[in-house]
Amino acid sequence: MEIFSTPKPTMDYTKFLSLPDSDNIRIKNVVKQKLLSDSDILYLLNASEDDLEPEDYFGKYVLPYYIIDNANAETHNYLCYETSFVEIPRYSEVYKVMQLIFYICINVKDVIHPQSGIPRHDLISALITRDINWSEAFGMKCKLIQDKASTTDLHYATRTLVFECELPNGISKTNMNTDESHFCNNDPDEEWW
């Protein structure tokens, strides 16, 4: 009888954090660093029951995906984000349109910031918009195309921000053995290695 063993990794996955051909992972890492270095955003998430260092917010209150555990008896404030590559601009195969989507989910019992009287999700939205709108944080200018308030069930007041940016469309390729990247010329006969 053969014994099953868990496969061993064949590479260092942290390479994807900086490779030019892994936009989804690379951009989410840039967003993570920006959010965790912004003490005002972390303050407004109001995780006061926890004594956290900035990096401890990641995976608990700052999430690189949009899933909130509604089965949890305690509701907290969350800042979720995702990337999406939705289309290629007309007449150009060299670029793709990236959407960076933020979901700011604030516990309805904690919506109003006591010192300012402004809803927390609006304040966090303003801080994110200040830093990303018309910036070149990802190499090309990002612009805000949606800013929408809503609710999810009875627990959260939310605000969704969608930023759009044109990025190079997979024109680089990295050899994972040598970590060398090169630009592709869209030649179907080109040898990759």
Predicted feature locations:
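Short acidic alpha-helical/loop segments enriched in Asp/Glu that coordinate divalent cations
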Residues: A47, V94-K96, Q115-I118
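Solvent-exposed loop and beta-edge segments used for protein-protein assembly and interaction
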Residues: A73-T75, S92-K96, D153-R159
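Active-site-adjacent structural patch at catalytic or cofactor/ligand-binding sites
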Residues: L79-V111
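Protruding loop/beta-arch "assembly-hinge" segments enriched in small, turn-prone residues
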Residues: I171-W193
